[in-house]
Design a protein with these regions (language model features):
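Small/aliphatic-rich secondary-structure junction motif
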Residues: 2-51, 130-139
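Acidic/glycine-enriched edge-of-secondary-structure segments
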Residues: 4-11, 66-84
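Residue-level signature of catalytic and energy-coupling elements of molecular machines
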Residues: 24, 91, 124
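Short secondary-structure boundary segments
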Residues: 39, 102, 107-108
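Glycine- and acidic-residue-enriched helix-capping/strand-helix junction motifs
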Residues: 50-61
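Structural beta-alpha unit
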Residues: 74-102
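N-terminal targeting/anchoring "stem" of glycan-biosynthesis enzymes
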Residues: 88-90, 126, 137
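Glycine-rich, Arg-bearing micro-motifs that act as flexible, cationic patches
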Residues: 107-123
């Protein structure tokens, strides 16, 4: 039996999106898979400045739980956690404990993506020696 493909997924508001779930499911269809989903706890600048991280963590946790449950219904056995607000740091933290074979970063479309405006996918590809796939999820048609 072959070793499972270890997939790290970094997504927040896009974590429930159908394109992301389709990408994960496609990899699961190829053979055994282990999936770790990390949802960075994104916060507004004002809330961050006021040190109010609780609302961001709760929102990320709710989205993450819904994502994990949806994946389980399709036969994928994922696990996940809420990560650092900085998605690159959240990715790095996850890679310290999860030896991924591949990373999927899910973002909003370019015109609405803060992560793409900050070149997150390009920076991740420069920083980590792993294949990094980019999946675009339009939140208005996410599920």
């Amino acid at each position: 039996m072959r070793e499972p493909h270890r997939l790290l997924v970094i997504a927040n508001e896009t974590v429930e999106g159908t394109p992301l779930h389709d990408a994960i499911r496609a990899r699961a269809d190829e053979g055994p898979i282990e999936v770790l989903v990390v949802a960075p706890a994104l916060n507004s600048r004002l809330r961050h400045w006021m040190s109010d991280e609780d609302a961001a963590r709760r929102a990320a946790e709710e989205r993450l739980v819904a994502c994990l449950q949806r994946l389980e219904r399709t036969g994928v056995r994922p696990y996940g956690w809420v990560g650092d607000a900085d998605p690159l740091l959240a990715m790095e933290d996850a890679l310290h404990v999860f030896s991924a074979d591949e990373v999927i970063v899910a973002t909003h479309p370019e015109e609405r993506s803060n992560w793409l405006a900050h070149h997150l996918v390009d920076r991740a590809r420069e920083r980590f020696a792993l294949p990094i796939a980019h999946v675009v999820v339009d939140a208005y048609v996410a599920a």
